[in-house]
């Protein structure tokens, strides 16, 4: 199963995340199938590749709870259903 989840990177205590598509059995920081966006919790900055995310969701990828919340804020699910 493909999951949309966060991949951690950055310095200690200055963490940022990449939103990636990965197999559910992969390690957290393993090689992703595709990088779909960026999330910085310290500044609440988010950059998303919306067409690629919509395609992955339509193909059956399951977002984790945190990624689901980020996508709901960006109103990505409205584009999936349209």
UniProtKB/Swiss-Prot annotation:
Domain of life: Bacteria
One Pfam assignment: Ribosomal_S16
Gene3D superfamilies documented for this protein: 3.30.1320.10
Record carries keyword Ribosomal protein: yes
PROSITE patterns: RIBOSOMAL_S16
One Gene Ontology cellular component annotation held by this UniProt entry: cytoplasm
Protein keywords: Ribonucleoprotein, Ribosomal protein
GO molecular function ontology, one term from the record: structural constituent of ribosome
Ribonucleoprotein found in the keyword field: yes
GO biological process, one term: translation
Family: Belongs to the bacterial ribosomal protein bS16 family.
Protein name (database record): Small ribosomal subunit protein bS16
Protein species of origin: Gloeothece citriformis (strain PCC 7424) (Cyanothece sp. (strain PCC 7424))
């Amino acid at each position: 199963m493909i999951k949309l989840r966060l991949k951690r990177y950055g310095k200690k205590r200055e963490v940022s995340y990449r939103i990636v598509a990965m197999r559910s059995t992969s390690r957290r920081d393993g090689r992703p199938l595709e990088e779909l966006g960026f999330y910085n919790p310290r500044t609440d900055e988010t950059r998303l590749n919306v067409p690629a995310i919509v395609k992955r969701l339509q193909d059956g990828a399951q977002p984790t709870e945190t990624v689901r919340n980020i996508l709901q804020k960006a109103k990505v699910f409205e584009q999936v259903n349209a």
